[in-house]
């Protein structure tokens, strides 16, 4: 972790990398402000403000969409477009980060050099990552149904279900925690393998993740806590700040620009952390 801290401090001298990540993060925050926050607010409204009902209604909505071939085709088209955008953006940004952490000399048009070398591979990997992420999230939502149903019954007055509720909730939380942790770690370490090896990217990334698994779990857990707390604050502000009037400027400033600054720093730290761990693994296996 000390090596990661040193790399983050050194990055302050590379304004080009910070600007590249800031540009990408601004696009993400714009989508988050105009699409993700309204959707989250809408989902909670569907369930009448009840969190458990919102989960069940969301699952029903998703399964309804998946039963329509037209929506599946729309979804695949959207995933393809998103993968191509990620292929362009990530191939350039990650190439710059990988070169920086590998202490390689900075070259002109480094971003576009990364796009030229890795666009196709990163696009294909991004398509798979996005598609697998959607399917995995749907599967995990379905996994929660028994626990949600039993918990609703318990909260509805069936106190005899206390032991069963605690058991199902604990098992479900453990499955969700380790399921998402394994999935995200393996997906994240797929990317640095592309920039450091010639083939077998997923296998190498998985091997790297397995080598430092518990160290990575602790690292990701810290990121999760920071990210979730910050998102909860933003979601709360989104629900209470007016969209018009004198305080509308404060809403835009907090939900867009403060969010943008914090997320830029967050994504840079996460990327450096993942690539630093992977490069430590590379040194270990290539000695």
Q: How should each PLM-predicted stretch be described?
A:
Residues 1-41, 105-112, 173-247, 251, ...:
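Nonpolar helix-loop interface/hinge motif
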Residues 3, 7-10, 54, 58-61, ...:
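Low-complexity, intrinsically disordered, cysteine-poor segments enriched in small/polar
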Residues 17-98:
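Short, small/hydrophobic-residue-rich motifs at membrane-helix boundaries and re-entrant hairpins
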Residues 27, 77, 81-85, 120, ...:
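Hydrophobic alpha-helical transmembrane segments of multipass integral membrane proteins
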Residues 35-50, 138-155, 232-243:
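Membrane-helix interface motif
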Residues 49-52, 281-287:
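Short, highly charged, low-complexity non-transmembrane loops/tails of multi-pass membrane proteins
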Residues 70-102, 140-148, 159-199, 249-283:
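Selective recognition of hydrophobic, aromatic-rich stretches within alpha-helical transmembrane segments
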Residues 71, 75, 107-137, 161-176:
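Alpha-helical membrane-spanning segments of integral membrane proteins, especially the hydrophobic core
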